Amino acid sequence: IVGYTLVDAATGRVVGEIESVDDSTMNLLFQVRTADGDEVLVPAHEELIRNIDTEERRMELELPEGLLDL
């Protein structure tokens, strides 16, 4: 999963690259680096995952509304 491109399933927009998985909290989080160099923490819940393409190293996630606006 680390190194995969994270894509917003609703819009098709590339969020960024998954740099690590944070398991220090009750819920897993993907640490994602955006094209602008910002860091975004995204919930890594299986119900949010829409598709994983291992050949393209892409993961589509149904992101919670407004998450990227924070």
Describe these PLM feature segments.
Residues I1-L70:
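Peripheral interaction segments used for macromolecular assembly
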